[in-house]
Amino acid sequence: MPRSTAEIAQRARETGRLGIDTEFMGEGRYQPLLCLAQIALDDGDGGTEVIVLDPLTEEYDPAPLAEILADPAIEIVLHAARQDVALLRRDWGSPVTNVFDTQVAAGFAGMRAQLGYEPLLKETLGVRLRKSASFTRWDDRPLTEEQLGYAREDVLHLLQVASVLQDRLTALGRLEWAREECRAFEAIDDKRDLDVVFGKLPRINSLEPAQRAVARELVEWREEAARTGDRPVSSVLHDAALIEIAKRRPASVDRLRQIRGLNDATLHRRGKQIVEAVARGRERDGIPVEGVRPSQPDAEDAPIIALGEALVRSRAMESELAYELIAARADLQRIVTSVREGEPEPEVRTLQGWRREVVGEELLELLSGRRTLRVGPDHRVEISSSE
């Protein structure tokens, strides 16, 4: 069995793939703490070798593994890859390429979207996992044999599941569709998009432009304070208090003290910083309401969006594809808005690649009035020309 990360990397090069899972702790931190990395390798005899790396107690060189993650010739197999990819990219300092996510693949193979690893194993291999250690303090040391057994079992069958799904997708002609979907993981990192954070603040639309400018400055200050102190963002300043501060724009700690939701510890430790952030926000240009995306569609669009959803769900069922893989409600809203306003097609995934082939073209014709939707005699949704 490989012992060093260099030996693990060499075996991955020889076999062309590597399975990986991580255990981490996110509670009480700004960023999750990597506690274990479990690696699965083909053993050359149809079985799997599992190696568990412990970054909290072992000194190991991640560089050889980082090279493997970045090598497009080597397939990296994960399940529900988003968090793992972001964590490995940050801690091992490497992009992650050629990802094959078994959760994504299951959606293309006729199973439900976001299928958990345990039901996926049961459905594909008839294997049942023990989950007694799934909610555990992975940062405690020493780990028990039960915890280590759970960690090993989490990747023991991963490569076999990937092979089964790839065979199914090849038979369905959808393997490249799944690989195309998995390529999106290459751009994932663990950096929070502050534009999104700002846009999702409660009651942000109720603030005046100058108040929104202060709110944006507070968002940026809060993020840096949380990152520097490795604390959850909400423990630095929760959203409701942030909005109230932006609304009142206090110029002193005494004024700040009048706002509900700020305890004495926060005022003592961060009061001056908050007031300084408010002052910087006052100097910023106002942010007009048009700069904040509405969270709800126009009421007049709701039935049209529902019509589009009906078509997408029908085509998803016919194609044995998970609906969530084809369209998101936000995509449908953007398509409906663009058709209504006579704007160019929006760049949404429903109108691109294989999705356009499955339903995107029909969706545009339906929403533009060139096609109609009805229930056929076999109780299936039919789309036909409106002429």
Regions found by a protein language model. Give the residues of each.
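N-terminal accessory regions of nucleic-acid-interacting proteins
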Residues: M1-L18, T22
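Alpha-helix N-cap/helix-start motif
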Residues: R29-Y30, G110-Q114, L267
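Accessory DNA-binding and partner-docking regions appended to nucleic-acid-acting proteins
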Residues: E145, V155, V161-E387
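Active-site-proximal helix-loop-helix substrate-binding element of RNase H-like nuclease domains
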Residues: Q38-L159, Q166, F185-E186, D298
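Helix N-cap/beta->alpha junction signal
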Residues: M1, A80-A81, H238
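Gly/Thr-rich phosphate-binding beta-strand-loop-beta motif of the actin/hexokinase/Hsp70
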Residues: T15-Y30, A37
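Short, glycine/acidic-enriched capping/hinge loops at junctions between secondary-structure elements
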Residues: R29-L33, V52-D54
